[in-house]
Amino acid sequence: MEIRQHEWLSASPHEGFEQMRLKSRPKEPSPSLTRVGANFYSSVKQQDYSASVWLRRKDKLEHSQQKCIVIFALVCCFAVLVALIFSAVDIMGEDEDGLSEKNCQNKCRIALVENIPEGLNYSEDAPFHLPLFQGWMNLLNMAKKSVDIVSSHWDLNHTHPAACQGQRLFEKLLQLTSQNIEVKLVSDVTADSKVLEALKLKGAEVTYMNMTAYNKGRLQSSFWIVDKQHVYIGSAGLDWRSLGQMKELGVIFYNCSCLVLDLQRIFALYSSLKFKSRVPQTWSKRLYGVYDNEKKLQLQLNETKSQAFVSNSPKLFCPKNRSFDIDAIYSVIDDAKQYVYIAVTDYLPISSTSSKRTYWPDLDGKIREALVLRSVKVRLLISFWKETDPLTFNFISSLKAICTEIANCSLKVKFFDLERENACATKEQKNQTFPKLNRNKYMVTDGAAYIGNFDWVGNDFTQNAGTGLVINQADVRDNRSIIKQLKDVFERDWYSPYAKSIQPTKQPNCSSLSKLKSPSKQPAMANATGREPLSV
């Protein structure tokens, strides 16, 4: 034991440390273990590389998506901006044929047109105007490109002896369809018309309006547009009776594309409802009014400085900048300083439903206001016929009553009774003719005129589709003034033996009627003859 200790102690220090180092050194790994570690390391490196590639791709994808979102948002903003820009300007549709307020014609000719039934006689000096049939045929003969017609009636091809003018008009329309002239027609859906079917087969475009689906009304509009230049508007529809037995009145504008620019939009509005069961919540800007009571069309009519605009009914059919018929009538009455003359078939300020009838004060109240508050003289010429509502006389009595105790309140009412003329006809004449009726629907004042499609009945304005025309003129003394001509027509009818101040009698004086002259013996157009103004 001592010897071994001595031997250990006698060994060199270097030798001892070398042995300790050898004993503490780990064993060398085996080759297989080395390969496993290398493979594991390589796998980790590959996964790390794949993860970095995926992260880079993800970043690129997110960046690309963000760019797409930004681009999409910019495109949407640009589209909205373009829409706003175009909504701020007047877009001219194809139907307007490139017309604008800058290039349209506002120096126009205008003519009153009337249909005076055969056997209706006036005094020698009574004014007469262009016959309605001749005026309509003139328009169709002038047509070169297009004829657009809105009418409440389509009954031209009748077998009655008095329907010959209606048949000629129908034949002319058929002829136009074969001459490469575009014919567009608008009618109420309830019209069961062989005339429309025949014209449709020949190529005419027919639009049926289902007013019942909108507000339980019907179409009563009556106007024409020819070649985007000429216009007719008035009381007459395309009915043979309007060219024979009915007393009708309207106006024709020649070379007046500025008025067409506005009226065409009402025609387009009707056409836009062709396949719709309800009115859109927002109208297209193409249907907005061009002129209204606030912005009237400035034009020359027969070289007379004038203003004009068209109105529409019901309120449901009045897009932005389109005057409602009631508002148009209000503007005419409010501007009157001396007198208001009104000629209508029916005057009945009542709104009726299936269950009740209520007072409708819109026009009746405006008349009372003019009488009482502004001392404007009012004359009402109302047709008397078998459909006259007995309540009409009650409302007339009520109107008259307000003037009994008020100074400077002047109201006179007459009933235009063609039943008297019918009663004086011979048996042979009665067999050949239908009852005659005055269907005029207009108002004239000392500075303006309104010509429309409605009687002054509540339901007409609130439910039915109709169009009105307002004309303002400062100088109404010139015989070329359409307002003076219309005033002369009113006075002619007012002073005729057919107008009575009280409820008409059923026993007419036939001998007095035989002494008067028929308008058929008068020239087609004549100026007013200078009759003294209507006494008030």
From Swiss-Prot:
One of its GO terms (cellular component) is endoplasmic reticulum membrane. Residues 503-536 are annotated as: Disordered. Residues 1-68 are cytoplasmic. SUPFAM superfamilies: Phospholipase D/nuclease (SSF56024). Residues 511-521 have a biased composition (Low complexity). It holds the Pfam family PLDc_3. It comes from the Eukaryota. It is found in: Membrane. Its main location: membrane. It is a single-pass membrane protein. This is Inactive phospholipase D5. It comes from Mus musculus.
